[in-house]
Amino acid sequence: MSHRKVSVLALALAGAVSFTTVGVPATFAVDAGTTTSVSVVSPAAQPNPSGDFEIDKNGVLTAYTGSSTEVTIPDGVTEISTEAFGNAQLTKLWISASVRVIGDDAFVSQDLKEITFQDDKAHPSQLATIGDRAFQSTSLATITLPGSVVTIGDNAFAGMSRLTSVRLGAKVAAGQLVAAFPGAKALASIEVDANNRNYASVDGVLYTKDHSHLIAYPQAKNKGGLLRGP
């Protein structure tokens, strides 16, 4: 058969074949000389596994299925769902700037000792909402929230027996924090950014901006317990 006839036949066969592009997990790799079995994942499949996380099509992290004590929330996650880490054993956590919402009970009762929120000029934090009991009964000693946080749920930091200080940003809305710290027996200081229009801090005590109402008096400053405003 001539070279021309072979070329024509090859083109005819190529035209009869259609190709479909499918997604595979980003961690897939093959070493030379080995055979690897790969599960092909349809882009429409939900939830979408990514490492030890289950993340839906909207970027909501619905569950952590791993066993590591040190966890990094990946970039692209927009929300950490209610009780997403209910079966985890966390001690150290890094949260990417893309996270906008931390849901109710997200990290409740974790032995969490260190938390870092990505928040810099190149990657400003988008975190706006912290849900009810989000960090309740964790082992954190200090918390510095990103300046983007607006709402903080009831009992968000309740029962945190090792918590000594909290620093709040400029955007925390009025009406927050009245019931955020019950049971935080070691809490000695609540500081707030001077540019916050709703709150002011004097010697670690939280007031409304005009100082007309007491919002929270840290429990370690008061032997009788945590004082709260109306």
What do the predicted segments below correspond to?
Residues 1-10:
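Bacterial Sec-dependent N-terminal signal peptides
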Residues 48-54, 65-79, 88-101, 110-129, ...:
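Structural signature of tandem-repeat unit edges
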Residues 29, 36-38, 131-132, 140, ...:
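Serine/threonine-rich, low-complexity intrinsically disordered segments
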Residues 25-52, 56-58:
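Low-complexity, acidic Ser/Thr/Pro-rich repeat tracts that form intrinsically disordered stalk/linker regions
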Residues 18, 26, 34-37, 95, ...:
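Generic short amphipathic/hydrophobic targeting helices enriched at N-termini
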Residues 13-21:
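Hydrophobic core
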Residues 61-62:
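A short, structured beta-strand/loop element
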